[in-house]
Amino acid sequence: ADLESKMTPDTHAMIVCNPQNPTGNVWSKEDLLRIGRLCLEKQIVVLSDEIHSDIVRDGHSYVPFASLPDKAVVDNSITFNAISKTFNLAGMKNAYFFTTNPVLLSRIKQHHRGDLSTLGVVANEAAYRHGAQWFDQVRPYLDNNHKIVESAVAKMPGVSVTKAQGTYLSWINFSSVIESVDASEMAIRNGKASPEHYF
């Protein structure tokens, strides 16, 4: 209901990040279908950002938006991806997108200026052709990093961590500790405060 209330007549697109950045939530097929059908009903195009799609923790499954069993929902979407997260190759200027909808594709071609990097094209091809074995070793390493952080945080009084289902990010909540030592007031007194809206 909250999501639907934010879909005004001025809303023309919705970005669905899967896995979600920064929380690491991996969307279920049912949730994606619900979001997709709601967007279709409201004539809102789904922009599916799947840049973290390969980085999913054990016990969770990534569902590509374009694989959903409702053709109308899929046709109302554009999927985006890149090698930057999976293969740690940010800056290659070689992200890509696709859609099953020829009308959306035509609109994109009309307004999108392609800006590929030659090095990025080579890196993309090399990563996808030869990087699977490397990434098969990285995935459990990243999962273990999450477990190390979660174990360490579990021993810290007043501190918690959101257990991510995907991505390599960990979000640690220090708010109880910060409040208990009045850190905000301390930062102001010492001239180290930043506007909260930056975070």
Question: Model features per residue range: what roles?
Answer:
Residues 1-199:
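PLP-dependent class I/II
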